[in-house]
Amino acid sequence: MFTLLTLCALFAETITIYPDHHSRVFSAHEKPVAHVHSGDTVITKTWDSGGQDEKGVRHLQQPYVYPESGNPLMGPFYIEEADRDDSLEVHLDKVRLNRNWGYTSYRLSPETLGPGAAESSYKNFYKMDAVRPQRADLIPWDLDLEHKIASPRLLQKSAYRFSLPVNPMLGCIGVATAGDEILTSGPAGSYGGNMDYNDVIEGATLLFPVYHKGAYFYLGDGHALQGDGEGLGTGIETSLDVQFTVKVRKGKTLSIPRLINEDYIISIGSQPEFHSNTDYALRMANSDMLKWLTTEYHLTAPEANLLMGTVVKHKIVTYFGTVATLIPRKYLSR
């Protein structure tokens, strides 16, 4: 007998939606921009962190100021079959650049450096409002869409040829937070959020806990490129074309987000930014990985501990709150 989810997969639809409004919170109280079913595919676009779209049109009255506000999000998407204690699987079919410019802050965040290092870095030569209203700390970048190269418009240059291959990613992705709590798209947590994880790229599959009927899925904050840790406090901020497919996993309760790509399975631990060291997020990610290995890959507890102790990798996702625990998939296909 076909289950409801099997029938949804058989009659899956592709929905194209380009919202003319946004949200800045991961909340179940926001009005959905679309109702979709498990198995459906959505084609959409995201604005940059300042609210500008692929044509340079600015959709926000006020600039982003942490933590009172947040990155503009597309969503929420209401997933009809999702309910509390399920998990939501989101496969990123496409994450593509759609304009030829972006921007970053001009130097590393002082909190990422040792005492005195920030002061001896370099002064800001950039003008107020040059890139975004009420911001004087931003550098514009040129994005070569044909060759997929990013280059900063530097005022001070050396002989160094500064051009980098792009790797488009989504900084914000997740579901509505648990209970009645309403969090802006500035922090990250068990629901996802502003994780700024540079493995959230085309081809990745993400898994999120579901805390409310409908899940209320959001995405936004596109980056053309970003290093581990988001040391600048930004990636190369830009707008994106995105296509994703959703699937509900009934009764598959999760405690934190997970990510699967061609090479790794990944547990993502987040904690309130600036409130504690990243060791708490690391412990969350490690604990979830142990559970994943024993419950879904059916390793014994000794096997899971020994595998993690010998082949685990870690990523500092953001310097202020998120850490990823990675296990190579080649050790799990035996």
Q: What kind of region is each of these model predictions?
A:
Residues 26, 47-61, 95-105, 214-224, ...:
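Short, Lys/Arg- and Gly-enriched loop/turn segments at beta-strand edges
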Residues 15-65:
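N-terminal, Lys/Arg-enriched amphipathic/low-complexity engagement segments
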Residues 55-70, 74, 102-114, 219-237, ...:
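Short, compositionally biased
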Residues 96-198:
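Intrinsically disordered, low-complexity linker/loop segments enriched in Gly/Pro
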